[in-house]
Amino acid sequence: INQGIVLEKLSTGAIHFHETTKSDIAQACCDLYQQSPENSRVMAPTKALVADINKLTQEAVNPNGNRLEFEMHGERFFQNLRLNDAILFTQNHYDKGIQNGSLGVLTSVDASGEGYGEVTLDTGDKIEVTQAVLDCMELGYAITLHKAQGSQFPRIIIALQKGRIVDRAWLYTAITRAEHEIHIVGTEDDFKAISEAPSHSHRRNSYLAELLKG
């Protein structure tokens, strides 16, 4: 991919291509996620698409979890985050052990003292959900590639949409987030256009050839 070569057979080795119309990409990613929730993460190029996929996926895999609730000025509010949801943190709070892009699971929605519940990070660390922490929490079934930073996941589902930031390097980087299995969801035309067009950034060397041999 990084050399701009499109494979005739789009599902090869550890990479699986799923031909999907633009309007069905979010649902297709949600369906693929459900096949192996504990190993999967969806990568999408825009916050809007991430939000769509997260909403669908929460409804599919965790519709009945108890919602996180908190009190402010004597009133009770519910956050659309449920017990056992995948969680993404969007700001740095080094004093609390989280940074922008940290991932975890909401493992408690029991309020105590200043806290509304608890998130267990992928590292195993437990984070108390205070108001400051809650303000930078969102669903994390799907995330932008930018938020993935250096993280890797056993199984990656890539929502592929042509757009300003999506080029060959973006797709290549998304693929390198996967340890074992990659699912690319989108139209074949978009896949070819993105793969064949010169990248916005410099080429990168990688283990992609090994993945394709699979």
PLM features: residue spans?
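Conserved helicase motor core of P-loop NTPases
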Residues: 1-98, 107-111, 115-117
